[in-house]
Curated annotation (Swiss-Prot):
The alpha subunit is responsible for the aldol cleavage of indoleglycerol phosphate to indole and glyceraldehyde 3-phosphate. Keywords: Amino-acid biosynthesis, Aromatic amino acid biosynthesis, Lyase, Tryptophan biosynthesis. This is Tryptophan synthase alpha chain. GO terms for molecular function: tryptophan synthase activity. The lineage of its organism: Bacteria, Bacillati, Bacillota, Bacilli, Bacillales. The keyword Chloroplast does not apply.
């Protein structure tokens, strides 16, 4: 399915709620169980983090989750196997968030083959500059897997146009300077930034980094096409507060109907 499965998540004005889970945090059986829960709860897409020892874009919550996964001996191979098994039950799109090093260490051709086996629809590589994306972009295109672009508040218009013109899936618009993590509020210029990104791409635009309350979700989906919630989802899963995740999803759906 690949790119088409991601497109379907945004069809007919749908607003996407995209939770992030760290692959292997709590073990691979827990990963599968969380994927099933998020699918049943109504998540639009699930973003799965590949744990890495030098996660430069991750805030403290996601760093700790990655460290727990690595300390427990979780491997990229194991995460793929868990995804292969759970894909038989879960139909929503899978997007991997991985740094470049684990892809190259695994072998990029082999990594993409395993993505196909696991039904992965897209990949985000936060430390892969646009200028170097040919390292994996042609292989991903051939496999019909979207390489999801990231743009930031400081990205000039021309760069946003260039980055998004050849991309597929959706645009990940980073809403804060710095790393992921929980924030209290967003500056007014974030609204104009998101509107600017939307006006210069044919793809859906999803806001991420720092989104941690239902109010944030409601605010962001009035401007763009969806949200990624990472650190807060990890916290809620860890503390068994799943009903709050369902409330986030409901907040997204309500804006869809508004």
């Amino acid at each position: 399915m690949g790119v088409e499965r991601i497109k379907a998540a945004f069809e007919n004005g749908k607003k996407a709620f995209i939770p992030y889970v760290m692959g292997g945090d709590g073990g691979l059986e827990i990963l599968k169980e969380r994927m099933r829960f998020l699918d049943e709860a109504g998540a639009s897409i699930v973003e799965i983090g590949i744990p890495f020892s030098d996660p430069v874009a991750d805030g403290p919550t996601i760093q700790r989750a990655g460290k727990r996964a690595l300390d427990s001996g979780v491997t990229v191979k194991g995460i793929f196997q868990a995804l292969i098994e759970v894909r038989k039950e879960v139909q929503i799109p899978f997007v991997l968030m991985t740094y470049l090093n684990p892809v190259l260490a695994f072998g990029k051709e082999r990594f993409i083959e395993r993505c196909l086996e696991a039904g992965v629809d897209g990949i985000i590589v936060p430390d892969l500059p646009y200028e170097e994306q040919d390292i994996i972009a042609p292989l991903l295109r051939e496999a019909n897997i979207a390489l999801i672009p990231l743009v930031t508040v400081t990205s000039p218009i021309e760069r946003i146009k260039k980055i998004t013109s050849e991309s597929e899936g959706f645009v990940y618009a980073v809403t804060v300077a710095g790393v992921t993590g929980v924030r209290q509020n967003f500056k007014d210029e974030i609204h104009s930034y998101l509107e600017k990104v939307k006006s210069h791409t044919h793809l859906p635009v999803v806001a991420g980094f720092g989104i941690s309350t239902k109010e944030h979700v409601e605010e962001m989906v009035t401007i763009c096409d969806g949200v990624v919630v990472g650190s807060k989802v990890i916290e809620l899963l860890e503390n068994e507060k799943r009903e709050e995740i369902c409330e986030f999803i409901q907040a997204t759906k309500q804006k869809e109907e508004a």
